[in-house]
Amino acid sequence: MKYRFLLAPAMLLTGCTLGDPGPKISPMAEIKVVNNNICLLAPVADGESMSALEIRTVEPEKNLRKHFTPPIFLSSTACTPLFGYRFQAGHNYGIFVNTERRNAQGKVVDARIIRASFRLGQDKNGKLQVITSTE
């Protein structure tokens, strides 16, 4: 009996997350430069939509975070909308896209975080190029 009283507070303090419906981390997205703009190709399935977007760099004032209601539908063959974010050569970036799929009743049945991490440079003509990409 004494051990039950010790076990209960220990379980409460550990923050047990059994059955946590949080999003899964998925494979890295592909980063390309198209018309001197960054293009993120997300490995999404049919019916998957973007509920949030975060673009991070070492300068906190240049970070971007957006939430979308209703979510924006994505395609694995089209660039993910980055809303005119101004990427600059010589900087490192991380992009995180929260995606979700809903059933016919509108309930979220699956959620993922798609991510990309990369450094930008410039070629001799001043065009952006991806120097490194973590995949």
Description of each model-found segment:
Residues K2-P9:
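Sec-dependent signal peptide recognition
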Residues K2, I25-P27, N63-F68:
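Short, intrinsically disordered, charge-biased short linear motifs at domain edges
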Residues L41-E135:
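Acidic, low-complexity Ser/Thr/Gly/Pro-rich repeat segments typical of extracellular/periplasmic
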Residues K24-G47:
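Contiguous beta-strand segments within globular domains
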Residues A8, E30-I31, T69-I72:
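Secretory-pathway extracellular proteins and peptide precursors enriched for disulfide-bonded cysteines
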Residues T17-G19:
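Bacterial signal peptide processing site
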Residues L12-G15:
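C-terminal motif of bacterial Sec signal peptides marking the signal peptidase cleavage site
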